[in-house]
């Protein structure tokens, strides 16, 4: 089927270039463009696109406000474009919490160069985002248990954007691509009907991709500060984003959250974010677990890679690891979970109904590796009941 895309961006160059690239994809139809958030909301109502690409810093109405309004009046999967800066990361997490599905780095250099690589990336991402379960505004924000807040980190204030003249441009109609035949849905093998018994795990590993920032925030903000095991979080994310993500989770939760550093010993009550652009391994030092950070292997698609982290931990602590796979596209984590199971450890995965993208957890479940399949809201209580 042809996917209808609405492009919202105040940069005339970026808007035109993005439209050119998207229009060259046979099963994508750019149905309109907008130069600010207010126009984006109006055109979303009028055109009812399948996917909206959204900048965050725009005149009249910024991207985050536009996402909230779109989720209220015309819920539609939104793909954010964000700068690779601390401020870009901060507002991207706000946009994801408001209801956006995923994000891509906004690179004028990449957009002005060879389009073949960015074309493949955009095509894959837009197809995945179009399948996402969007969330209504208000219901999208993770509901956390009321807890004493940590001191808030100072929030950078950005300069007001320069005004830009509104420009909208409906795309010229093109021939529709022939409808694709529906693919058979993989069968999810039933997980064990009983709950896995409470165990004294040495480490809890959580792997996720698309939809993960909101899912992780929802889980971590419901865990007590005295959680009895360390958590290692592997989220597919650029290197410039993981420090800001760790700071956000640390500010919002009672756990201590930080980006993992090479050589540090994992401690209960702490959550460690695998740094972007590198691989995070867990090694054993006596009875303790220690972090080992390596430069990302160029042969691996994901940096950080869930399979790498899970696999490194499997033989170090046989039968003493809990692996959790949350929402995300692709199958990263399946082989790592297989290694955990082969060494006697336990695996939980997220269910289809509450996954933004049911890719990674489906890969684990269909391979028969999940001991429990849980809804997103069930993970925090199960972690509290099952770990310790």
From Swiss-Prot:
Which residue ranges does the record assign to the CheB-type methylesterase domain?
197-388
Query: Which residues are in the Response regulatory domain?
Result: 4-121
Any one GO cellular component localisation term in the record: cytoplasm
Give positions of region: Disordered: 137-196
Q: Which family does it belong to?
A: Belongs to the CheB family.
Describe its function.
Answer: Involved in chemotaxis. Part of a chemotaxis signal transduction system that modulates chemotaxis in response to various stimuli. Catalyzes the demethylation of specific methylglutamate residues introduced into the chemoreceptors (methyl-accepting chemotaxis proteins or MCP) by CheR. Also mediates the irreversible deamidation of specific glutamine residues to glutamic acid.
Task: Quote the NCBIfam families the UniProt record gives.
Answer: PRK00742.1 (NF001965)
Which named protein is this?
Protein-glutamate methylesterase/protein-glutamine glutaminase 4
Q: Which organism is it from?
A: Hahella chejuensis (strain KCTC 2396)
């Amino acid at each position: 089927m042809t996917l209808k895309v609405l492009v919202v961006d105040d940069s005339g160059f970026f808007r035109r270039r993005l439209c050119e690239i998207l229009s060259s994809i046979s099963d994508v139809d750019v149905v309109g463009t907008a130069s600010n958030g207010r126009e984006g909301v109006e055109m979303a109502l009028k055109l009812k696109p399948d996917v909206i690409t959204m900048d965050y810093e725009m005149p009249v109405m910024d991207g985050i406000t536009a996402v909230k309004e779109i989720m209220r009046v015309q819920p539609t999967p939104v793909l954010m474009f964000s700068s690779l800066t601390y401020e870009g990361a901060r507002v991207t997490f706000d946009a994801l919490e408001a209801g956006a599905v995923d994000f891509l780095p906004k690179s004028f250099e990449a957009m002005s160069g060879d389009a073949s690589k960015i074309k493949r990336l955009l095509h894959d991402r837009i197809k995945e985002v179009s399948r996402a379960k969007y969330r209504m505004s208000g219901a999208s924000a993770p509901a956390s248990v009321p807890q004493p807040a940590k001191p808030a980190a100072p929030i950078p204030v950005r300069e007001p954007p320069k005004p830009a003249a509104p420009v909208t441009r409906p795309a010229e109609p093109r021939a529709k691509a022939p409808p694709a035949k529906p693919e058979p849905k993989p069968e999810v093998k039933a997980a064990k009907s009983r709950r896995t018994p409470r165990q004294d795990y040495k480490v809890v590993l959580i792997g996720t991709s698309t939809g993960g920032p909101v899912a992780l925030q929802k889980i971590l903000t419901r865990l007590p500060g005295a959680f009895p095991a360390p958590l290692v979080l592997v989220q597919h994310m650029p290197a410039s984003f993981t420090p800001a993500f760790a700071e956000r989770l640390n500010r919002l939760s009672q756990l201590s959250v930080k980006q993992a550093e090479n050589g540090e010993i994992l401690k209960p009550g702490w959550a460690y974010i695998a740094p972007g652009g590198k691989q995070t391994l867990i090694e054993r030092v006596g009875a303790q677990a220690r972090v080992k950070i390596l430069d990302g292997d160029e042969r691996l698609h994901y940096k950080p890679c869930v399979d790498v982290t899970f696999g490194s931990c499997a033989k170090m602590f046989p039968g003493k690891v809990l692996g959790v796979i949350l929402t995300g596209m692709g199958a990263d984590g399946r082989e790592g979970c297989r290694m955990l199971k082969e060494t006697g450890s336990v695996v939980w995965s997220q269910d289809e109904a509450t996954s933004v993208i049911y890719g990674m957890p489906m890969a684990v479940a269909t391979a028969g590796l999940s001991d429990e399949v849980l809804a997103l809201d069930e993970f925090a209580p199960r972690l509290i009941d099952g770990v310790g």
